[in-house]
């Protein structure tokens, strides 16, 4: 709970809902006749609407990226370290929009929402959405907010994929794109981890083919397992070692097979449990699928530089040395393709011990890079506030 | 602007595509893109320099020439590859020189000339590795591991069939004069070469 709102916070924020009664045809061929997107905004849109920045969320993220919902909030939004007055995404300069993606479970239309055509929750019948679908629905939100183009589209991990897709799909509407701790496509190992997570969920006896809602039950054990696997891949060996080492919860070994004995086990259990209480299992399946499917080069015989051809923005690509989910060489692959396609790109490989999660943690070098890039973005804006 | 950079800028044609190895704070690329419509990228490893390039809006890519080389760039992907004051600090300058001419038809290279008379005199008189304005390091903490002279560099170019288009030397005030042009290996402090295959 914040006793006082820190001066570099965006303060108390209120989520908003945008209702769309315009059909959206998805990449899978299915159509959503109506849907809603939950979003938040920070800062003020300037007179010529040129200072808007879009924040795209990662796998389990949502619209609440910065500030607090109330004075009772225990934690600020998920990217509060980077969004606020004086922070890299400076709300004194930029108007920031952050949303919950379609298929999410934080207020945007998703598997847990009521399907207006049946009057029941979509559940597993919610269509598979892709990064491209998200970007298209985000463009509809931009139209609604009367934002003709983004000064920058920014995202980490799965959010970085959306930033990349924006630059390809709507080149005229993106001036800058920051792709952080991301990849142009998942590796087989990445997909394998996602499949383990999905299998954990679908093999929970309470999963009922995704119709757990109708059985008034919930596959929380499976979701917990999925998150535990995911969480291991978000940290590095070093950061886990530093946080927990081989510390025991009790003084002595219990020689029991089922007890939680090591601190790291206890931590994973805690993270898994907390997550399984707050996240929809069908959404988790959906989001990991969107990750698996993303591959803008596929339509160009695997040639990423060809896929990037339409883009007009200036890119920032950032990777972190200990990120083994999307390691630096995945970012370099992207940078090389951008150079080949003669795009404006800058790349920094930030030395951080925090693994994939480093993109959420404000280390000095990372913030310097981000500040440098966003400072230049601000300078480009005519009549910046 | 550093004088070797201000000489180089006159050797770069407008509208060309440039790769600047060890681009520092991006001064040269910033000038070239503002005044000569040059498009380019700088490679750099210093984090302060990378941040400064980002501020300037110069495309900078973090890449260590020693560990990664230039193999991630395709043949002839640039018009010009520039490397100022970095040749002497890399592990394999000869390999790098070939790589530079694989990426572009032309290259510009500047380095401190170890044949400069004051350095020779310093070593002869004191019997110690020279420390000067252009080489301000002691032997144990210098980044310069392959110091060479004007003559050494030309010998390398000769062996590798690299053609020298222009060469010049400047003094520590970064001036050229008739004396250092006459005896460059003895009187030039910084060597500036424009080479091609």
UniProtKB/Swiss-Prot annotation, chain A:
Its main location: cytoplasm. Residues 51-360 form the AB hydrolase-1 domain. Keywords: Acyltransferase, Amino-acid biosynthesis, Cytoplasm, Methionine biosynthesis, Transferase. Coiled coil: none annotated. It holds the Pfam family Abhydrolase_1. Its EC number is 2.3.1.46. It is found in: Cytoplasm. The keyword Chloroplast does not apply. It catalyses: L-homoserine + succinyl-CoA = O-succinyl-L-homoserine + CoA. Transfers a succinyl group from succinyl-CoA to L-homoserine, forming succinyl-L-homoserine. HAMAP family: MetX_acyltransf. This is Homoserine O-succinyltransferase. It comes from Hahella chejuensis (strain KCTC 2396). The lineage of its organism: Bacteria, Pseudomonadati, Pseudomonadota, Gammaproteobacteria, Oceanospirillales.
